[in-house]
Design a protein with these regions (language model features):
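A short beta-loop-alpha structural element at the N-terminal edge
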Residues: 3-18, 132
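Conserved GNAT-fold acetyl-CoA-binding loop/helix
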Residues: 21-44
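Conserved active-site tyrosine of GNAT-family acetyltransferases
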Residues: 43, 124, 129
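Conserved beta-strand in the GNAT
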Residues: 54, 60-68, 75-80
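A conserved beta-turn-beta hairpin within the catalytic core of GNAT-like acetyltransferases
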Residues: 68-77, 86, 105-107, 132-137
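Conserved acetyl-CoA-binding loop-helix of GNAT-fold acetyltransferases
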Residues: 81, 87-100, 122, 126
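Conserved beta-strand-loop-alpha-helix junction that forms the acyl-donor binding cleft
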Residues: 83, 111-121, 137-145
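Conserved GNAT acetyl-CoA-binding A-motif
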Residues: 102-114
């Protein structure tokens, strides 16, 4: 399979939101309960194509990363990969790109991962991230790039 990576376009907002819902609904439902309107509003509030890298296999959106600058930190809002395309290097490629950007900018790279998503926490630890703090629902992780 060949994957292409590029910056998102405004016109992809709906497809990105659908992928977000597909992958994240189970975790969010278990922690807080899922509210369609709240999720759509929150997604729209934070949607910024300049901070989003999309991954396609041919014309199908199969993953994305969403990054924000927060002071002296490059913060990963989300790395999402379609379940049928997980464990094929997409998440690692997206994460390595963010870490490289952090190094260029001499910034720390941070993120939060749900405590119930043990697989994701292990993925980030494998890539050098450490748990620095926690909230009631998430681990706060960081990496000095």
């Amino acid at each position: 399979m060949t994957y292409s990576y590029r910056k998102a376009e405004q016109t992809e907002k709906e497809a990105i939101f659908k992928l977000y819902c597909l992958v994240m609904r189970g975790y969010i439902s278990e922690i807080w309960g899922w509210n369609d309107q709240w999720q759509e509003n929150d997604f729209s509030t934070h949607f910024n194509p300049k901070g989003i890298t999309v991954v396609h296999e041919e014309s199908e959106l199969v993953g994305y990363s969403h990054v924000e600058n927060r002071g002296n930190q490059l913060f990963i809002r989300m790395i999402v990969v379609h379940p049928h395309h997980q464990r094929k290097g997409i998440g690692s490629t997206l994460l390595e790109s963010v870490v490289a950007s952090g190094k260029e900018q001499s910034e720390k790279v941070g993120l939060e991962v749900f405590k119930i998503n043990d697989e994701a926490r292990k993925f980030y630890e494998k890539h050098g991230f450490n748990v620095e703090d926690e909230t009631s629902s998430s681990y706060v992780m960081g990496l000095i790039a």
